[in-house]
Amino acid sequence: MTTIKIAEAGVPVKLFSLVPVKRSHSVCAQGGINGAVNTKGEGDSPWEHFDDTIYGGDFLANQRQVLGMCEAAPAIIHLMDRMGVMFNRTPEGLLDFRRFGGTKHHRTAFAGASTGQQLLYALDEQVRRYEVAGLVEKYEGWDFLGAVIDDEQICRGIVAQDLRSMEIMHFRADAVVMCTGGNGLIFGKSTNSMINTGSAGSELYQQGVKYANGEMIQVHPTAIPGDDKLRLMSESARGEGGRIWTYKDGKPWYFLEEMYPEYGNLVPRDVATRAIHKVCVEMGLGVDGQNQVYLDLSHIPANVLNVKLGNILDIYEKFVGDDPRKVPMRIFPAVHYSMGGLWVDIDQMTNIPGLFAAGEAEYQYHGANRLGANSLLSCIYGGMVAGPNAVRYAKNIKKSVDSLPESLFESYTKKYQDDFESILKMEGDENPYQLHRELGQWMNDNVTVVRVNERLKKTDEKIQELQERFKRIHMADTSRWENQMAQFTRHLRNMLHMARVITLGALNRNESRGAHYKPEFPERDDENFLKTTIAEFTPDGPKLSYEDVDVSLIKPRLRNYAVSKEETKE
């Protein structure tokens, strides 16, 4: 969407992607996109959507930005509909909406169970129009290495590497917008694509860009267990009537419905995840003694499931071998999304002038917990804000990038060329894939659902140990063509830096808020921590500070999904 908005203004765009754009991780977003269109006459409104989002994020999101997103949401859905997205419809021909977690309204527009893919494909068709017109130039299969920042601390372009030829080049720009997604690979196995290392955001953090709320990591309650990676089972399965249960005293126990009678199986993700973790890990009531519970759709007619959830049910059947139309699925929580990201202002610009960010790469719309189906919305809305603001910035800049000497850009290119050469020459005894496996294990065990300070301290010590061992990596592949090992090693270095941001942010936040839960500090502490965590890079590790959250529109209140939202306002 950022590319489209810039090209609409007649400004040329270079679009870089690690993979072919249609293989970006947005294709894995299954369930839908939120917007208070209110076709079902439930009294929904953008303000209700806004209140649900702020309440669901445990009041850590800046409120004016979130309100702007929720007010724009209905128009965004209608825009995507006009672009040709095949949204499901009611028998009357109206857009159909399903219910997602953390709301009592049917607010989520959907295209079966492949909404992200359909949105991405529709947007790419629009990008191709501008490509034909000569306004957009795609660079697919390029890895972002770093921003070009001049002596005045202004972003002037990027340095990137062609992952086929391994050629490193600089690209001048009056404005740069980062839409590089999340960092799930830091945790080893996750629902994220294997490209989601967070390397680009980490590199910018090391260059002086502030990183906000890094500790806020969403663990999705329903993922398909697997030995290689974890695959998402969409919240839409519960939105269409799926029920989570396990056996207790020899009988089915629908524990979410018992614990949270008001919202049942559609409590927000952090709440459901902690409940499943408690049932399996603390109570030992997982299915067959394993860390798994049932997600049951077998009571719903198969023809209904095929229309609304066919894609994801086929995925489960393919990888597990059971037909979820006939037998309950086995699921368990998995790392899914980063609410934290690059710090940006209301214009989507970072603290480095000329450098913008949108989507999961930045932090401002989800607070301490993202509501399901707000992700695709925030990506599109963030792009709609970032694009025009980047154009406005570029047109009003005092000194154009064209007036800068070539030596500035050559120095950055040489810096990253030298770094690549040093990686190729690493001749130690450590395996980068083994280091990554250890990092993922420690992060998954200690920095996800339940966080204990002593374990967080040991995890940070482990990360520093891995950073020392990183210096002794053995580069088995020294080829200069499509060298995936060298690229992975560079990403691993950046993952290690970001892992410290996440871990130390969690260690220092002595409260429980949204996805961040500490048994030692089980209550929310608004007096000390109704604040955004800001991490800034130093050679000795992240330097943390805190920034007040905008709560000017809705006063913070107790978050309790066992009762209706109205009761919490009393």
Task: List PLM regions with ranges.
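Glycine-rich active-site loop/strand segments that organize a redox cofactor
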Residues: 35-69
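Short beta-strand to alpha-helix junction loop
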Residues: 61-71, 109-124, 139, 190-198, ...
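Conserved redox-cofactor binding core of oxidoreductases
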Residues: 81-167, 172, 179, 220-225
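FAD-site-proximal beta/loop scaffold in flavoenzymes
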Residues: 146-170, 322-364
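Glycine-rich loop(s) and the adjacent beta-strand/alpha-helix scaffold that form part
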Residues: 175-230, 287, 369-389
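An anion/pyrophosphate-binding glycine-rich loop and adjacent beta-alpha core
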Residues: 203, 209-322, 389-395, 432, ...
